[in-house]
Amino acid sequence: MPRRRRRASRPIRRRRRARRSTAVRRRRRVVRRRR
């Protein structure tokens, strides 16, 4: 049973990190194009 709880909390953390990395990559690309 403890394995099921760990698996549910792992995907949630990966989704939050993926959203932050996409926002940072889009902002860096915009700064390079403007310069």
UniProtKB/Swiss-Prot annotation:
Name recorded for this polypeptide: Sperm protamine alpha isoform 2
Miscellaneous comment: Two isoforms exist, a major form and a minor form. This is the minor form.
Keyword Nucleus: yes
Function comment: Protamines substitute for histones in the chromatin of sperm during the haploid phase of spermatogenesis. They compact sperm DNA into a highly condensed, stable and inactive complex.
Superkingdom in the source lineage: Eukaryota
Modified residues (Phosphoserine): S9, S21
GO cellular component, one term: nucleus
